[in-house]
C-alpha cells in the first residue's frame, strides 16, 4: 500500500483539477499506515487519554486493534460507539455537555479528517479559522485586528 503522505499529496493535487471526481476513497481506510500516522497526530493531544464509553484509551492501541478496525471497515460492520457524556463549566457558571469519543473512533475520525482536509482545505476562504490546520482563535483575532480597524463593537453569541 502507498504511504499516507503520498496518498494525501495525490488527493491534494487532484483537488486542484476542477471537476475531478474521486473514486474509492473508502479504500484508504484499509491502509494500516494511515492509522499509525493518525495515532502519531492524536496521541499527545490533551484529553485524548480519557477513556471512551468502551473504557479503552490510546495507551492500549496496538496493531491488532487497528487490524480489527480495518476488518470492520472492509466488511462494512464498523459502527462508532456512543460518546461518553460529561459536563464542563462555562464562563457564566453553567455547564456545557461534552462528548468523549472512544479512542478507536478518534483514530478513524483522524484518518477521515486527513483525507478530507487534503481534498477540501484549499477551497476554504482565508477568513475561515475554525478547526483548520494552522488556524486558531489567535489567528482569527489577528485577522480581525488587521482588517476591522474602526469597528466599535462586536456581537458575541454562543451557538
Q: Which residues does each PLM region occupy?
A:
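Conserved phosphate/pyrophosphate-binding and hydrolysis machinery centered on Walker-type P-loop NTPases
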Residues: 59, 101, 130, 134
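Generic, well-ordered alpha-helical scaffold segments in large soluble proteins
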Residues: 7-10, 14, 72, 110-119, ...
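Conserved catalytic palm subdomain of right-hand nucleotidyl-transferase polymerases, strongest
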Residues: 48-57, 99, 138-159
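Conserved pre-motif C helix in the palm subdomain of viral-like polymerases
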Residues: 95-124
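Extended, charge-enriched "interface" segments that sit outside catalytic cores
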Residues: 58, 82, 86
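Non-catalytic, polymerase-adjacent accessory regions of viral genome-replication enzymes
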Residues: 1-67
Amino acid at each position: 500500500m502507498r504511504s499516507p503522505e503520498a496518498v494525501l499529496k495525490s488527493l491534494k493535487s487532484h483537488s486542484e483539477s476542477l471537476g475531478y471526481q474521486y473514486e474509492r476513497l473508502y479504500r484508504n481506510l484499509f491502509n494500516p499506515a494511515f492509522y499509525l500516522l493518525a495515532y502519531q497526530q492524536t496521541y499527545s493531544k490533551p484529553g485524548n487519554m480519557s477513556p471512551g464509553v468502551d473504557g479503552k484509551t490510546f495507551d492500549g492501541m496496538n496493531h491488532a486493534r487497528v487490524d480489527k478496525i480495518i476488518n470492520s471497515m472492509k466488511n462494512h460492520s464498523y459502527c462508532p460507539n456512543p460518546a461518553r457524556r460529561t459536563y464542563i463549566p462555562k464562563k457564566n457558571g453553567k455547564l456545557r455537555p461534552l462528548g468523549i469519543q472512544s479512542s478507536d473512533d478518534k483514530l478513524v475520525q483522524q484518518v477521515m479528517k486527513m483525507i478530507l482536509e487534503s481534498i477540501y482545505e484549499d477551497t476554504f476562504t482565508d477568513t475561515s479559522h475554525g478547526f483548520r490546520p494552522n488556524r486558531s482563535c489567535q489567528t482569527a483575532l489577528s485577522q480581525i485586528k488587521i482588517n476591522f480597524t474602526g469597528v466599535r463593537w462586536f456581537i458575541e453569541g454562543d451557538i
